[in-house]
Amino acid sequence: MRTSHLSRADPPAKDRLRRVEGRHNALVKQMRRAFSRAELTEDGACAIEGVRIVQEAIRSGLRFDAVFFRESAEGQAKRLLPQLGAHVETAVLPDKLFASVVPSETPQGVAALVRYRHSSLEDLLAKLATGPLVVVAGLQDPGNLGTILRSAEAFGAAGVVLGEGTVSPFNAKVVRGSAGSLFRLAVVRVKLAEVLVKLREKSVRLTATSSHKGVSLPEASLDGPLAVLIGGEGAGISKDVMAMVDEVLAIPHAPQVESLNAGVAASIVLYEIARRKSAG
C-alpha cells in the first residue's frame, strides 16, 4: 500500500508536528525497543533512521506508522512532511531524547517506524526464472549483509534467504547498508535445511563461493535455475551443507590477498550472472 501525499485539505506541515518530551511515550518506547532488538515490532513495523533511508522507504511505497524528528533538525521536517500521508504520526523530540532512541552515534535527525512487506519462501522460488536466489548462512557482519541485499537488487536476484545464525535484516547497520533494497527485495528467514530440501525438489543448482578451490568463475556454467550460497566470515559453510553444493565457484584474485569478504564475493558472482544473462 503506497503512502498518500498531502492533499489541499491536509494541515500545514508545521501544524502536524507535536512535541514529545517523555521517555515513556508509547511510540518512543516502541521505536527504542525495535532499534535495540533489531527486530520488527509486534505490529510488524521496522525502525529506520536517517534522511536517505526514510526517503527510500517513501520511494518504495512503504506504510509509515510514525516519524520522529530531532528538535535541532526541524529543517528536515519541512522537507519530508509533505511527502508523508496525513495519517502518519509525526513528532519532534528534544535532542537528548532523540539520541536515546536511535542507535547511531551521529544521528541524522529523523527516525521512523515503517511497515515491512513480508515474502514467503514460495514467493522467492516462484521467481527463480527471473534471477538467482541468494542463500546466506551464518553471516554475522551487518555491513556485509547490507551489501549483499543491495547487490542482490542491483543485479536482479530473485530474492535472499537468510538461514539461522545470520544477523537480523532489521539491524540498523543492515538497513542502512542496503540503501533501501531491503524495502523492495524479497527477503525471508528460514532454516537452511528447509531451503536446501526445496531447492533439491525444484532441481535448482546450488553453488557456493571460495577464494581458492573450485571452478574459476569465468569458466563456470551459470545457466538455469541457480542458488548462490554465501557463508559467514569465520566458520564459513559447514561440511554437511557443502556436501550438498553442486559446484564451488572460485573467484580469481591476487594470491597475496587471502580472501574476499562475503559482501564483495556475493556481489562479484551476482554481477557475473547478470552480465551473462544480458549478453544472451
Predicted regions and their residues:
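Boundary-proximal intrinsically disordered activation/regulatory segments immediately upstream
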Residues: 1-79, 166-167
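RNA substrate-binding interface of SAM-dependent RNA methyltransferases
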Residues: 4-5, 52, 59, 94, ...
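Short, aromatic/basic amphipathic alpha-helical patches
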Residues: 75-87, 241
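A glycine-rich helix N-cap at a beta->alpha junction
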Residues: 84-103
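C-terminal edge-of-domain segments
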Residues: 105, 110-114
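Structured adenosyl-cofactor binding patch, chiefly the S-adenosyl-L-methionine
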Residues: 112, 151-155, 164-181, 239-280
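Active-site/ligand-binding-proximal alpha/beta "capping" segment
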Residues: 207-257, 261
